[in-house]
């Protein structure tokens, strides 16, 4: 088949495979367009779960007549115009493909009027070439989009739609999320002619909490702790439920927004979970509604087809900022009974780690000594960048927890180091460089073998085999246990009952290898792995390890370490001289027995004498 340009309708339907997953996806895209148009009231009418009708009506700025045809074309948008705009996106939409994709899998009608126009105009696309027809219509200032018979021309997609109730529940959840993101917009949701949800626009903080209670429920509002945290261009606001009173129902409330865009970001979720883990059970999850504001240049939103995920340029900074913000409000909640004391200004600025005391380290700029104020109480009700506690009336709290006396005593105790011992520590004997050495690396052969010279003999060493033995030695606990390295984002996997039982039996042996996990009803969460596995693709390796353990009747640390060493991916597809020398140095240090008695497949002598004799006889 020759290469050819796809027809517009087919190209749009392919794009719709990413944009239009179900009716809720259509609602999300269209409502976000209304928000970008500056609408303050949006009416959403749904029939038969969105399969028959989706109608979005707003009072936004509208679309000019001459731009209606472009609105239904692919890659046409008013949101961005250059690469600089793409790198600093502040609108919800920016790709210019939603309307074209939706119109290719439904009967879409767009009616709009701007304030400058005396009449409205209606546009719809049809046919193989998606030609747009525009005609006059009656309509107030704003836009109405009607999507009829979704997936009518793609029966395979329509067959995979769920029941009417299920699809509407997904739409309802999307509207809930949008209502939490935009308190200043009125949202009305109707299903089959009946008004189901009505979220009126609110302005004051007390009214915001009423909408929060209407969406998330009174139990969440009663346990909600308000947060306001700031550092430079980073701002964190919202509510987190008191972990001591978090229930299974509350744990379903996990909403986070980045610059007003609803997200499902693992980094943010991990930071919140880590801040709450001391007060949460192993099978519990935190409940929160949080809003992160960040410089648009520091976040990339163009990394997911449905824009559900983002990528931060300084992910570690964002993670620690959120972690500290949530941790501080939780500590303030539990430490308000500790006495406060005044502290005289220090003679010079010494940065200190005050995360554990609940102080916002990010919000404290470095101030020259000469510009410092006289001694004042650390606790200040109006300090910017602080964290709030529980609020019943409304308003963001600006209270910042101060220096705690008890924590100061602990801190001073930690500074008291024991006297140095005059007894010298025994020095480990150095390995005999001659007897415990593979020899000198001459060159790399075939990309994965090292040619060695030792005592006038030439040998060929398999670098992948040597690396496997080194990994096994690094994983096998010796006199000191293997150090577990916590994962920035824990790996959560679904397991069967048999796999879960095998993991429970093998847990002591895995712990010796530095693999730490927690399990609940149907899932296991890997929280730490040993250092040699940090750079591995754990989403592939761990399920394979679980499958291996499920097939075993008895467990031994050495056998598990050997299996892992054989199944990890090599970090060096092509070896260099420096990498080979470094590997052999580690093998000689950790596995001296391999030098004395090399196992099969590691070393192969090269017979130079026969080659030399052959040359002499020529």
UniProtKB/Swiss-Prot annotation:
UniProt entry keywords in alphabetical sequence = DNA damage, DNA repair
One GO CC annotation, please? mismatch repair complex
Tell me the Gene Ontology biological-process terms attached to this UniProt entry.
mismatch repair
Q: Which SMART domains match?
A: DNA_mis_repair, MutL_C
Which residues does the annotated region (Disordered) include? 371-401
Q: Where is the composition biased (Gly residues)?
A: 382-392
Q: Which InterPro entries match?
A: DNA_mismatch_repair_CS (IPR014762), DNA_mismatch_repair_MutL (IPR020667), DNA_mismatch_S5_2-like (IPR013507), HATPase_C_sf (IPR036890), MutL/Mlh/PMS (IPR002099), MutL/Mlh/Pms-like (IPR038973), MutL_C (IPR014790), MutL_C_dimsub (IPR042120)
One family from Pfam that matches here is HATPase_c_3
List the Gene3D superfamilies hit by this protein, alphabetically.
3.30.230.10, Histidine kinase-like ATPase, C-terminal domain, MutL, C-terminal domain, dimerisation subdomain, MutL, C-terminal domain, regulatory subdomain
Q: Which GO terms fall under molecular function for this chain's record?
A: ATP binding; ATP hydrolysis activity; ATP-dependent DNA damage sensor activity; mismatched DNA binding
The family assignment reads: Belongs to the DNA mismatch repair MutL/HexB family.
Function noted in UniProt: This protein is involved in the repair of mismatches in DNA. It is required for dam-dependent methyl-directed DNA mismatch repair. May act as a 'molecular matchmaker', a protein that promotes the formation of a stable complex between two or more DNA-binding proteins in an ATP-dependent manner without itself being part of a final effector complex.
Checking HAMAP family in the record gives: DNA_mis_repair
The record, for NCBIfam families, names: mutl (TIGR00585), PRK00095.1-1 (NF000948)
What is the name listed in the Swiss-Prot or TrEMBL entry for this protein? DNA mismatch repair protein MutL
């Amino acid at each position: 088949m020759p290469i050819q340009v796809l027809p517009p309708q087919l190209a749009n339907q392919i794009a719709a495979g990413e944009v239009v997953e179900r009716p809720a996806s259509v609602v999300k895209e269209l409502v976000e367009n209304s928000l970008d148009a500056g609408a303050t009231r949006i009416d959403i009418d749904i029939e038969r779960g969105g399969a028959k009708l989706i109608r979005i009506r707003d009072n936004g700025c509208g679309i000019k007549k001459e731009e209606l045809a472009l609105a239904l074309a692919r890659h046409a948008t008013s949101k961005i115009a250059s690469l600089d705009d793409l790198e600093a996106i502040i609108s919800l939409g920016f790709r210019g493909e939603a309307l074209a994709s939706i119109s290719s899998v439904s009967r879409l009608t767009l009616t709009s009027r701007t304030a400058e126009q005396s009449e409205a105009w209606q546009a719809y696309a049809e046919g193989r070439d998606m030609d747009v027809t525009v005609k006059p219509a009656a309509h107030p200032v704003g836009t109405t989009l009607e999507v009829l018979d979704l997936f009518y021309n793609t029966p395979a997609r329509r067959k995979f739609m769920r029941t009417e109730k299920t699809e509407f529940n997904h739409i309802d959840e999307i509207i809930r999320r949008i209502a939490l993101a935009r308190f200043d917009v009125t949202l009305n949701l109707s299903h089959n002619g009946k008004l189901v949800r009505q979220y009126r626009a609110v302005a004051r903080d007390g009214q915001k909490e009423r909408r929060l209670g209407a969406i998330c429920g009174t139990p969440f509002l009663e346990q909600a702790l308000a947060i306001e945290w700031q550092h430079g261009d980073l701002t964190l606001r919202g509510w987190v439920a008191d972990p001591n009173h978090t229930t299974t129902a509350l744990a379903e409330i996990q909403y986070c927004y980045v610059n007003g865009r609803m997200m499902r970001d693992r980094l943010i979720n991990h930071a919140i979970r880590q801040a709450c883990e001391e007060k949460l059970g192993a099978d519990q999850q935190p409940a929160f509604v949080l809003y992160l504001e960040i410089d648009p240049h520091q976040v990339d939103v163009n990394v997911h087809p449905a824009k559900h995920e983002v990528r931060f340029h300084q992910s570690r900074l964002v993670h620690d900022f959120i972690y500290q913000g949530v941790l501080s409000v939780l500590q303030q909640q539990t430490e308000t009974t500790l006495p406060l004391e005044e502290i005289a200004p220090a003679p010079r600025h010494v940065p200190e780690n005050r995360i554990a005391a609940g102080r916002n380290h990010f919000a404290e700029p470095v101030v020259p000594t000469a510009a410092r104020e006289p001694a004042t109480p650390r606790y200040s009700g109006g300090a910017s960048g602080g964290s709030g506690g529980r609020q019943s009336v409304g308003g963001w709290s600006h209270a910042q927890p101060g220096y705690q006396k008890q924590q100061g005593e602990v801190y001073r105790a930690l500074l008291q180091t024991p006297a140095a011992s005059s007894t010298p520590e025994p020095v480990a004997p150095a390995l005999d460089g001659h007897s415990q050495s593979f020899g000198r690396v001459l060159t790399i052969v075939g990309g994965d073998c090292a040619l060695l010279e030792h005592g006038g003999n030439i040998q060929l060493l398999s670098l992948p085999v040597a690396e496997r033995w080194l990994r096994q030695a690094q994983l096998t606990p010796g006199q000191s246990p293997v150090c577990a390295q916590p994962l920035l984002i824990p790996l959560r996997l679904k397991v069967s009952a048999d796999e879960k039982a095998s993991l429970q039996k093998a847990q002591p042996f895995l712990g010796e290898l530095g693999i730490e996990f927690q399990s609940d009803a149907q899932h296991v969460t890997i929280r730490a792995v040993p250092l040699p596995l940090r750079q591995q693709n754990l989403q592939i390796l761990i399920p394979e390890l679980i499958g291996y353990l499920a097939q075993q009747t008895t467990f031994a640390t050495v056998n598990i370490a050997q299996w892992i060493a054989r199944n990890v991916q090599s970090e060096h597809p092509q070896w260099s001289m420096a990498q080979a020398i470094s590997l052999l140095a580690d093998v000689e240090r950790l596995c001296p027995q391999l030098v004395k008695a090399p196992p099969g497949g590691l070393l192969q002598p090269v017979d130079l004498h026969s080659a030399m004799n052959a040359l002499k006889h020529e």
